[in-house]
């Protein structure tokens, strides 16, 4: 929970974070003792994992830290899984597409059904979760 402030940047619902933290692995990229970027990855199936949270401290954004962490995650999880999924909303698709993620499926109403408050990203109300997939092997 020491990284909760960073995790909340990517997912504003602490109850949701608690759920996937229990099932997942936390990865932290730090500069010295200061955490800069965090990620949580959980099993998705026997052959795939899911990136549940990826967040970078605002003062370190747009400097390549999330990219470095993602590349490390791909190498680490390629030994255990064939693919990685990530659930995101519209604004996040372009970021993940840079790494070779492509659309897998959509969960209609995910954000409105699972979050107590409406979620907005770049002024847009989030409703559906877009699942993207990347082959790791």
Specify the residue positions occupied by each region the protein language model found.
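Conserved beta-strand in the GNAT
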Residues: 28, 34-43, 47-55
């Amino acid at each position: 929970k020491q990284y909760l402030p960073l995790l909340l940047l990517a997912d504003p619902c602490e109850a949701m974070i608690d759920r996937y933290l229990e099932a997942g692995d936390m990865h932290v990229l730090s500069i010295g003792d200061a955490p800069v970027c965090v990620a949580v990855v959980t099993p998705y199936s026997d052959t795939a994992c899911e990136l549940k949270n990826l967040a970078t401290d605002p003062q370190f954004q747009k400097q390549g830290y999330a990219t470095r962490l993602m590349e490390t995650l791909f190498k680490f999880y390629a030994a255990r899984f064939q693919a990685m999924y990530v659930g995101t909303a519209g604004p996040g698709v372009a970021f993940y597409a840079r790494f070779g993620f492509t659309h897998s499926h959509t969960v209609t109403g995910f954000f409105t059904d699972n979050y107590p408050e409406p979620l907005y990203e770049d002024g847009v109300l989030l409703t559906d979760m877009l699942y993207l997939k990347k082959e790791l092997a």
